[in-house]
Every structure is written in structure tokens, then in C-alpha cells.
A protein has these predicted regions:
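Distinct, well-ordered alpha-helical segments
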Residues: 33-36, 60-75, 92-100
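Mid-to-C-terminal alpha-helical segments outside catalytic/metal-binding sites
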Residues: 168-201
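Divalent metal-coordination and catalytic microenvironments
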Residues: 46, 106, 151, 187, ...
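Active-site gating/metal-coordination segments in enzymes
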Residues: 1-52, 105, 111
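Active-site glycine- and acidic-residue-rich loops that bind
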Residues: 83-93, 112-135
């Protein structure tokens, strides 16, 4: 915890470069004791500094409430907590809405990823499934808690190596959202307002 607080500029002595986000804190489907220890330290550091937390969830599991319970116990503000990899649980409407009701951000960050995950025996949700789920979340009143991202984590995901690169959401997914009736004002909330809220309040 002390090291995290130092890196975030919350100690007396300051590092040359300040971190502005805690994470992505990794949680596996086994949710090991070491992972819980790391998560608790992140929660304490966030409580001490006000810096937001981003948590890697194993998307096909349902560990979001356990994660939020731990962060809450450590004093973290759930309104500055981002739960990553929410795409695979898109059809579990109750789960996602309950997490949003607790204040957390739901990050749909597997957009444009048409991968088969052998360890999960599961296919990534399609862009159409993602768009419909996001539209339903908006219709249910959760627009201010949705984040969009691509989770670019492989070399082959860069345009230079044949991937979608970093512009896929703007070039391809935003037009799809428009086709689902999402307005320009709503898109501004998703693309600009919500990222600001993660950091600002």
C-alpha cells in the first residue's frame, strides 16, 4: 500500500512521475489470496489518494460483487472504480445492473475482438451483441456508468500487424451505436463525459 501511495503522489516524498490510475489490478477465476491482497492494497491506496482503480475481471465469471465488497471494506470510492471485461456477461442483465447500482463503471473493452477463448470454451461477444447490450443499459438509466475500450494487448492487434488498431471504436463501433439510435449527445457522454467522471467525480 505504501509503495502505491508513493507512486500516486500521496506520500511526503514525491516520485518524478506520478501515476494517475491504479491498475489494471488482476483477478483470475480462482481469485487467489495474493490477488485479494493486491486488491486490498489498491483499495487502501485509492482511499488515501482519491485516485481511481481499474480491475481486470475474468469476464465469464461473476466476481464483480466480491471485488466491490473488498474495495468497499478498504474505503475505496466505488464511483471511481472501473470493472473491466464486462462484455462476456452482457446477457446477465441483473448482474450488470446490480454492479452499476453500487456505483461502479462497467467497461465494455472487448469491442472488435472476434476471438475464441479456449480456456473459457467461449467466443467473444460480437459487436452487434455489445451494441445492443449498451443500448439496453442506456435505456435502463446507466449511461453515465458505461466505458468503451478495445483492450489492445497483443502486437497483432495493431494496424501495422493486421489488427484494428486504436481507431476501431471511432471508425466502426460509434456508427453501429448510431444505428441503434444512440444520439450524438449520448455518444459524447460515453466517449468524453464518462472517462472524465472516472477521474473527476
Amino acid at each position: 500500500t505504501e509503495r502505491l501511495i508513493y507512486d500516486l503522489g500521496g506520500a511526503e516524498e514525491k516520485p518524478e512521475v506520478l501515476a494517475g490510475l491504479i491498475g489494471e489490478i488482476g483477478i483470475s477465476s480462482r481469485f487467489t489470496p495474493d490477488e485479494e491482497k493486491s486488491l486490498r492494497a489498491a483499495g487502501r491506496a485509492s482511499a488515501a489518494t482519491g485516485v481511481p482503480i481499474e480491475v481486470h475481471l475474468p469476464g465469464w465469471e461473476r466476481l464483480g460483487h466480491r471485488v466491490l465488497d473488498i474495495l468497499e471494506q478498504e474505503g475505496a470510492n466505488l464511483r471511481h472504480t472501473v470493472l473491466c471485461h464486462m462484455n462476456p456477461s452482457f446477457a446477465d442483465k441483473r448482474y450488470q445492473r446490480e454492479l452499476a447500482q453500487r456505483g461502479a463503471f462497467l467497461e465494455y473493452d472487448m469491442i472488435g475482438m472476434s476471438y475464441y477463448y479456449a480456456d473459457e470454451s467461449a467466443q467473444s461477444p460480437s459487436d452487434e451483441e455489445n451494441a445492443r447490450a449498451i443500448r439496453e443499459l442506456i435505456d435502463d438509466g446507466y449511461i453515465q456508468q458505461i466505458l468503451l475500450s478495445q483492450d489492445v494487448f497483443l502486437k497483432t492487434m495493431l494496424t501495422r500487424y493486421g489488427g484494428h488498431g486504436y481507431g476501431y471504436i471511432l471508425k466502426h463501433f460509434v456508427p453501429r451505436l448510431r444505428r441503434h439510435g444512440i444520439s450524438g449527445e449520448q455518444l459524447e457522454t460515453l466517449m468524453i463525459g464518462n472517462p472524465q467522471r472516472v477521474f473527476g467525480g
